[in-house]
């Protein structure tokens, strides 16, 4: 069973160098990075930094999209409650996915509280997310 660590803005592991240092410090091949595309992109990183880490260091991808600049006053609130469908934002998602290993597990982390509160049901929120993720993965 593998373990992953996640980079997030303003947290202890907040940049690729710290990710790599943590993985090397632990010294286990089953410790890898979870790439949360929102956190990665909003931290100013893209596919280039993922390629530099190497696909063997990537263990999981949490896929969502967002704008490059904040859409809410609180980053935490935006990350927890209002992410965007893959392809609806500004992140270089196709390039990020290309840097990941071909067999990486990809999960969707796309909370949409505003839509839920406006009466849009879970399946109607989920369908476009799954369709967009499939399209990205099939490129």
Where are these regions (language model features)?
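Short, internal active-site loops enriched in acidic
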Residues: 9-11
């Amino acid at each position: 069973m593998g373990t992953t660590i996640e980079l997030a803005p303003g947290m202890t592991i907040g940049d690729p160098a710290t990710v790599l240092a943590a993985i090397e410090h632990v010294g286990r091949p089953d410790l890898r990075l979870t790439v949360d595309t929102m956190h990665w992109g909003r931290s100013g990183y893209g596919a280039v930094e993922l390629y530099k880490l190497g696909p063997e260091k990537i263990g999981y991808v949490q896929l969502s999209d967002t704008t490059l600049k904040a859409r809410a006053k609180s980053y935490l609130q935006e990350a927890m409650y209002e992410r965007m469908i893959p392809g609806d934002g500004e992140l270089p998602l196709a390039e990020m996915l290309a840097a990941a290993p071909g067999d990486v597990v990809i999960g969707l982390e796309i909370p949409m509280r505003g839509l839920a509160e406006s009466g849009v049901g879970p399946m109607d929120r989920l369908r476009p997310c799954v369709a967009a993720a499939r399209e990205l993965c099939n490129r």
